[in-house]
Amino acid sequence: MKRFAVLLLTLALAVCCTLPAFAADTIEVNEDVSVSDDYDWTRFKGQNITLNVYNWGEYISNGSDDSLDVVSAFEDLTGIKVNYTTFDSNESMYAKLKSGAADYDVVIPSDYMVAKMIAEGMLKPLNYDNIPNFQKIDAEYRNPDYDPQNAYTVPYMLCTTGIIYNTTMVDKAPTSWADLWDEQYAGNILMFNNSRDAYAIAAFKSGHDINPQSTEEVDEVVKELKAQKPLVQAYVMDEIFDKMIGGEAAIGVYYSGDAITMIDDNPDLAWVFPEEGSVLSVDCMAIPATSEHQEAAEMFI
């Protein structure tokens, strides 16, 4: 789960949303939403299309806390049904697509996974005539190394990793990744159940490059992770929410947007960006090569 980090793409589905580059009649979607542009949102009505969307958990506005229910508004506007399911790691998403166990029309992989999926022919090239809101993406996030010219993906969210801790259980605010190895928190530390992020944290902590140049570097970082293991209460992904919000652990590591959510639910929690730095990642919307509804999927994007 990577909830609401930094939003890169604002969908046209917003309250009284207007795209200033266009002039057209306003479509009233429901009591909360209207759309005014010349994009033909209704061209698939009556065609009984279902889009299978596979996203990180709680990674789109869903109507909670008085927010807009984007999926519901999209369905009302377009007549397209959305079958929305979630995953908690790039690797589990990749494995499911690779195995052919399910067919998806929109997926949200992270930057490094995008490069892998492109290389393996797992994504369709996008037709940007069907994605006019791409013009709203900041130039800094266009034409990335992992997807030159954004041929296959639209950047969706930006996030970092950091330390979340319970201020009633941690006397001094942590400042370093090394605090996740502090023996005073033995049995109260939550670590990523995600090899890529866990490796990066141990590399930062030990002063190594997160992109190793030798097997010796890898071995040294792995030693750090092995040394930490006796101190760890649990290796987690989404499980961190219940544990940190419920006061079951003192300190852990997770994504920036999710930390905000946890802090909202438990004001005793706080989040810090470690002094050694952190990993910055971009999650992207893409269409699997097996999708049979590319144009409708591009409409959703």
List each language-model region with its residue ranges.
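General small-molecule cofactor/ligand-binding pocket signal
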Residues: N83-T85, Q233-Y235, A270-V272
